[in-house]
Amino acid sequence: MPAFDPEFSGGALMDINIYNIHYVVGLFGKPKNIEYYPNIEKEIDTSGILILDYDRFKCVCVGAKDCKSPIANNIQGNNGCIYVDTPVNSCENLKVIMNDGTTTVFNENKYDNRMVSEFMEFIDTIHNNDLERCYKMLDHSLIVSEVQTIARKKAGIIFKSDIN
């Protein structure tokens, strides 16, 4: 499988952890420092912990292709947390849980398929020739790619495509 093949620039960071990176960068922007601690088997990271440092707080992103556990995404703060029990690329049933136990649930997904809203935004961007939105999303993608590249290179994960 390409996800586990260094010949195809695979691995957990490149595959499953990309969703976490998009999520965190979308919320907080570019981190100040990036570290990745992979578990390497047969020349590929089958899982790993990515730590993104934002000076005042840290984000820990776990991506694993070698095991399975219940999905849990938490953003913890002084007054409570934001909890999502679905993959970050769908963010269904986002719960704001305050320290006093008060819970508010949000679900902005209007469609059964998580991709519908994204495709509708693409269509809207194209039809309205919204170059500002286009470049904003491009900048986001470039930061995500930079985070991913720095993380794997600092962890010593080098692909053949890096050498050529």
Could you describe each region identified by the protein language model?
Residues 1-34:
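Predominantly a Rossmann-like dinucleotide-binding segment in NAD(P)-dependent oxidoreductases
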Residues 32-33, 57-58, 80, 131, ...:
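Generic structural signal for secondary-structure transition and capping sites
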Residues 4-6, 103, 129:
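Short amphipathic alpha-helical segments at helix-loop
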Residues 124-164:
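C-terminal helix-rich "cap/oligomerization" subdomain common to oxidoreductases
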Residues 17-23, 46-48, 118:
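Internal, well-ordered alpha-helical segments in soluble enzyme and binding-protein domains
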Residues 12, 48-50, 111:
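Glycine/small-residue-rich pyrophosphate-binding loop that anchors the diphosphate of NDP-sugar donors
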Residues 39-45, 54-124, 133-139:
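NAD(P)-dinucleotide binding in Rossmann-like oxidoreductases
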